[in-house]
Amino acid sequence: MADERPLVKPLEMSRYCVPFSPFRGRVEEAIVCLVSTAGVRLGSDAPFRAEGDTTYRIIPGEASGADLAFDDTHYDHACAERDVNCIFPIDRLRELAQEKRIGGLTDRHFSMGFTQALRELRETTVPMLAREVDRARPDAVLLTGG
């Protein structure tokens, strides 16, 4: 009898992803930008829509972990509720900058929430976000998820 299971199409976005880009500079001199998909935002900003949201939020470089909230309901929040730095390590990076282990932080960072609207994400959100990150002039970008 023939296998009647439906063929599963691979994740549409996978052929566009580049998971790694080697860093060739000196980490001690690198200005770092944070980009997260964990739904992190300033507590005063509009929440991400938990059912799906293709927008992103800008987080000022001077923000601390205490200023942040997160909305994505698609991962376990146990650790993040104790310390948001496990999903958006802004305080830890600031400590590394004070210790001269990195060059510093950009004046703004970025976060997105959950979405399955991959075409809109790929064609609209990601290009806009990439331009924003480029304008922040980082030497390195740290990507985090939830």
Language-model segments: which ranges?
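An N-terminal assembly and electron-transfer interface module characteristic of large anaerobic redox
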Residues: 1-146
